Amino acid sequence: MKYFSVLVVLTLILAIVDQSDAFINLLDKVEDALHTGAQAGFKLIRPVERGATPKKSEKPEK
């Protein structure tokens, strides 16, 4: 949700300021950084989830 909010705010600023090349380049870099950070976060979360879930132990039948 924060990612979406940041993009909305930056888009509104872009509409107000006018479309200058420098500002568009800055907006692209911020979007890329947020996207890369989100991907890195998901890559870190998955192994933690796997380690946190208990493994099912198979009990031998008697």
Swiss-Prot record:
Entry GO terms, CC: extracellular region
Tissue expression as described in the entry: Ejaculatory duct of adult males.
Signal peptide: 1-22
UniProt keyword annotation of Cytoplasm present: no
Entry superkingdom: Eukaryota
Function: Male-specific peptide with moderate activity against Gram-positive bacteria.
Disulfide linkage: none
Protein name: Andropin
Natural source organism: Drosophila teissieri (Fruit fly)
Induction per the UniProt record: In response to mating.
Primary site of residence: secreted
Protein localization: Secreted
Biological processes per GO annotation: defense response to Gram-positive bacterium; innate immune response; male-specific antibacterial humoral response
Coiled-coil regions listed in the entry: none
Keywords on record: Antibiotic, Antimicrobial, Immunity, Innate immunity, Secreted, Signal
Keyword Repeat assigned: no
Family: Belongs to the andropin family.
